[in-house]
UniProtKB/Swiss-Prot annotation:
<dbReference type="GO" id="GO:0005739">
    <property type="term" value="C:mitochondrion"/>
</dbReference>
<comment type="similarity">
    <text>Belongs to the phosphatidylethanolamine-binding protein family. Mitochondrion-specific ribosomal protein mL38 subfamily.</text>
</comment>
<dbReference type="Pfam" id="PF01161">
    <property type="entry name" value="PBP"/>
</dbReference>
<keyword id="KW-0687">Ribonucleoprotein</keyword>
<dbReference type="InterPro" id="IPR008914">
    <property type="entry name" value="PEBP"/>
</dbReference>
<dbReference type="InterPro" id="IPR035810">
    <property type="entry name" value="PEBP_euk"/>
</dbReference>
<comment type="function">
    <text>Component of the mitochondrial ribosome (mitoribosome), a dedicated translation machinery responsible for the synthesis of mitochondrial genome-encoded proteins, including at least some of the essential transmembrane subunits of the mitochondrial respiratory chain. The mitoribosomes are attached to the mitochondrial inner membrane and translation products are cotranslationally integrated into the membrane.</text>
</comment>
<dbReference type="GO" id="GO:0005762">
    <property type="term" value="C:mitochondrial large ribosomal subunit"/>
</dbReference>
<dbReference type="GO" id="GO:0032543">
    <property type="term" value="P:mitochondrial translation"/>
</dbReference>
<dbReference type="GO" id="GO:0003735">
    <property type="term" value="F:structural constituent of ribosome"/>
</dbReference>
<feature type="transit peptide" description="Mitochondrion">
    <location>
        <begin position="1"/>
        <end position="17"/>
    </location>
</feature>
<comment type="subunit">
    <text>Component of the mitochondrial large ribosomal subunit (mt-LSU). Mature yeast 74S mitochondrial ribosomes consist of a small (37S) and a large (54S) subunit. The 37S small subunit contains a 15S ribosomal RNA (15S mt-rRNA) and at least 32 different proteins. The 54S large subunit contains a 21S rRNA (21S mt-rRNA) and at least 45 different proteins.</text>
</comment>
<keyword id="KW-0689">Ribosomal protein</keyword>
<keyword id="KW-0809">Transit peptide</keyword>
<dbReference type="InterPro" id="IPR036610">
    <property type="entry name" value="PEBP-like_sf"/>
</dbReference>
<keyword id="KW-0496">Mitochondrion</keyword>
<protein>
    <recommendedName>
        <fullName>Large ribosomal subunit protein mL38</fullName>
    </recommendedName>
</protein>
């Protein structure tokens, strides 16, 4: 006897279930958006009341209310996901800060601790609060990953620098680049030399352009690494100024044996951002550095063996 299998309408049941779930999800989404908009309007009214009390006020409480009134709106989240960033809006700066703290800040701090940069530079306790992007190719915006070893063909050029503070205020900064591993064969110690120094740089989040490096107290000088030396740690620090302008006499500073803590103390500077890369000797170093205008003389140091 031939067995007959009953026909089960599985496809129609699945489609029916999917349509039920889709309708439920759509209703849940609309209800969520309605709640978000109601909360946003409530916070916005509180913000308007604060601004009516003092229209010129730009306190942290005002920025907090601006962020709360927009951060959960679907259109704001969509623009942030598509990288349509409005740098004049505090809510986008807040989300950028969250994104930066979740990865880039942790990576930077890990490299600084791993390579003992904080201890050897003398900056003491340090918690960066601005995003520092640095690169050597002006044709693209690809920043160097902190701790990367770069060849001399790259580092012989003046780098570009971009700083993003996560607030709408305009502040003035100084930027300094230090070589932490310059050997002194007479004292058998390592010294810190200054490779680059910029001062009185106005920076605000709304103006996303690379820093003007044409006016510098010390023009950029590439790191000088001789044959046989280990990799040099090149630290770039962004220092926030208390005033819009600091005046440094032309003969007050020298590149050699640079004391960072004393420099920050004299001119009242606060480290708020950093970047790190490394440089080593390679076959192109002699030819490139000998032609650089900031390097007066490049020659391999002759190290004699200490007599027994």
């Amino acid at each position: 006897m031939k067995r007959v299998w009953p026909r089960i309408p599985t496809i129609s049941n699945v489609c029916r279930a999917r349509s039920i779930y889709s309708a439920a999800q759509e209703n849940a989404y609309r209800s969520s958006v309605k709640l978000i908009q109601e909360y946003s309007e409530k916070v916005h009214k509180k913000l308007q009341a604060k601004l009516l009390e003092n229209p010129s006020e730009t306190s942290p409480e005002i920025e907090r209310l601006q962020v709360l009134s927009q951060i959960n709106l679907p259109e704001v989240r969509s623009k942030f996901h598509k990288k349509e960033i409005d740098y004049t809006n505090p809510v986008f700066l807040y989300m950028l800060k969250q994104q930066w703290e979740d990865y880039q800040k942790l990576l930077l701090l890990q490299r600084l601790e791993q390579m003992k940069v904080i201890k050897d530079s003398g900056i003491g306790s340090f918690s960066p609060s601005v995003d520092v992007q640095l690169g050597f190719n002006p044709e693209n915006n690809d920043s160097i990953t902190p701790g990367t070893i770069l060849p001399s063909t790259v580092t012989v050029k003046t780098p570009w620098l971009s700083v993003l503070p996560f607030n709408c205020k305009k502040n003035h900064y100084s930027v300094i680049t230090l070589d932490l591993d310059v050997p002194n064969y007479e004292t058998n110690r390592f010294e810190t030399h200054c490779n680059w120094l910029l001062t009185n740089i106005p920076i605000e989040a709304s103006k996303r352009v690379p820093i003007d490096t044409s006016k510098a107290f010390f023009q950029y000088r590439p790191p000088i690494v001789h044959r046989g030396e280990d990799k040099h740690r090149i630290l770039t620090l962004v220092l926030r100024q208390k005033s819009s302008s600091i005046s440094i006499p032309s003969n007050a500073l020298v590149r050699e044996r640079f004391d960072l803590s004393e420099f920050c103390s004299i001119y009242d500077l606060e480290p708020v951002g950093a970047h790190l890369w490394r440089s080593g000797w390679d076959s192109d170093a002699v030819a490139l550095l000998s032609k650089h205008p900031s390097v007066h003389e490049y020659r391999d140091i002759r190290v004699e063996r200490i007599p027994a």
